[in-house]
Regions:
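Short beta-strand-centered segment that lines the nucleotide-binding/catalytic pocket of NTP-utilizing
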Residues: 53-67
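Conserved lysine of the Walker
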Residues: 39
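Conserved small/polar residues in nucleotide/adenosyl-binding loops
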Residues: 128-135
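Conserved nucleotide-sensing/catalytic segment adjacent to the nucleotide-binding pocket
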Residues: 68-104
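N-terminal pre-Walker A segment at the start of P-loop NTPase domains
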Residues: 1-14
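Walker A (P-loop) phosphate-binding loop of P-loop NTPases
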Residues: 36
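Hydrophobic anchor at the beta1->P-loop junction of P-loop NTPases
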Residues: 31
Length: 135
């Protein structure tokens, strides 16, 4: 388990950028936490770490955003989904094996039925306590 405590959005982004450089293509990262606890902030830093130049925002209404950088970033937001079945209905499983990039899933706790033991789970409690857990 990796523990990281952040005292600011900037620290969260810096941690995420460094973490991104250590991930392999095909990695799925589940971001779990309440509203306003830094999931999108983490995603922004992560995107920066893999060379995404575009502005990264939470795809709450789009559900999925794809970004090109040194590697592809699939950014999924499950906030508006009611169940894992909703995730499957939008073709979410197609983003879980990205050979040329990484998939970040915000609000992953809403799709627990599709969780996999190979995923990395990051629990955001608040900006002052971001806990990364790798299984």
């Amino acid at each position: 388990m990796i523990n990281f405590e952040s005292n600011s959005p900037e620290q969260t982004q810096a941690f995420a950028a460094d973490f991104a450089k250590k991930t392999l293509n095909g990695t799925v990262i589940a971001l779990i936490g309440n509203l306003g606890t830094g999931k999108t902030t983490f995603s922004q830093g992560f995107a920066n770490g893999i060379g995404v130049k575009q502005s990264v925002i939470s795809p709450t209404f789009k559900l999925v955003s794809e970004y090109e950088g040194e590697r592809v970033l699939n950014h999924i937001d499950c906030y508006r989904l009611e169940s894992s079945q909703d995730f499957l209905n939008i073709g979410g499983e197609n983003f879980l094996n990205c050979d040329n990039g990484v998939t970040l899933i915000e609000w992953a706790e809403r799709i627990k039925e599709v969780w996999h033991e190979d995923w990395i789970y990051i629990y955001s409690v608040s900006y002052t306590h971001l806990r990364a857990h790798e299984t």
